[in-house]
Regions:
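NAD(P)-dependent Rossmann-like dehydrogenase/reductase catalytic/cofactor-binding core
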Residues: 204-260
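NAD(P)+-binding Rossmann beta1-loop-alpha1 motif at the extreme N-terminus of oxidoreductases
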Residues: 1-59, 128-129, 190-192
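Internal alpha-helical scaffold of NAD(P)-dependent oxidoreductase catalytic cores
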Residues: 104-114, 130-166, 178-216
């Protein structure tokens, strides 16, 4: 049972996941530790959960989120190996570090312990994330509990670990490119006379609604695009310009560059 939840790291992504988890779990069962204690204390005050030190999280929590950057993971886990090895009860580690395999996390932790590897994205901070995950040595019951705890963060999808880096390039890196697109749409609106705030609002809501239509209709994006383009209309003229400028190829190249 994943009754107690700990976070080692309370940065942007760790904080976003902690906020989501505290909506599904009793905050009094959530423990936060961070290299800068003040950051953990501020988040704990916001959420009504507890603060402690890394060793206490490693020794007491059933589900431990490893919420540090990949280059900091070994430094985080090395001092905790003995504590983890001496635990009498079962625990699950959850890593959100890009590029670190489950096997590498287990090696750093010093044991073949249960691990869930997740690839969240920044929209998880508003409950609209797309989070891929894969597991090792995790029971079906533990996975079900984990999914319940993570549900407030957004959609979760199990993928083979061999695909999780590619998935992250689409949904993890993708928000940055969507923000660029929203900014460019707003710039175009301003060039046509719209106030900046209105142009940004219209662009962002349009992207939100368009994405919802793709997900809920089940239609191919190309079919939805065709439905907007009237013969000889203004939309198809804009589509023509984007095709001439190489939008599709540029986006595909961005995904591939991020993957490589």
């Amino acid at each position: 049972m994943l009754n107690t939840i700990g976070f080692l790291g309370c940065g942007n992504m760790g904080g976003a996941i902690a906020r989501a988890v505290c909506k599904a779990a009793d905050p009094q069962n959530v423990w936060l530790a961070n290299r800068t204690a003040a950051k953990a204390e501020a988040l704990a005050a916001e959420l009504g959960c507890n603060t402690t030190i890394n060793d206490e999280v490693a020794g007491r929590c059933d589900l431990i989120f490893l919420a540090v950057k990949p280059q900091m993971m070994e430094e985080l886990l090395a001092p905790l190996r003995f504590t983890l090895a001496e635990r009498p009860s079962r625990f699950v580690l959850c890593s959100m570090a890009a590029g670190l395999s489950i096997a590498r996390i287990q090696e750093m932790a010093g044991s073949d312990c249960p691990v869930i590897r997740i690839m969240p994205n920044t929209p998880a901070s508003v409950g609209a994330g797309m989070i891929q995950y894969c597991t090792s040595n995790v029971t079906a019951e533990e996975e079900a509990e984990f999914l319940k705890l993570m549900a407030p963060a957004g959609r979760l999808d199990a993928v083979p670990e061999s695909l999780i880096d590619a998935a992250s390039c689409v949904s993890g890196c993708g928000p940055a490119w969507v923000y660029q697109f929203i900014e460019a749409l707003a710039d175009g609106g301003v060039a046509c006379g719209l106030p900046r705030a209105k142009a940004q609002e219209y662009a962002a809501q349009m992207v939100l609604g368009s994405a919802k239509l793709v997900l809920e209709s089940g239609q191919h994006p190309g079919a939805l695009k065709d439905a907007v383009c009237s013969p000889g209309g203004s939309t198809i003229q804009g589509v023509r310009v984007l095709e001439e400028k190489g939008l599709r190829g540029a986006v595909m190249d961005a995904v591939i560059a991020s993957y490589n």
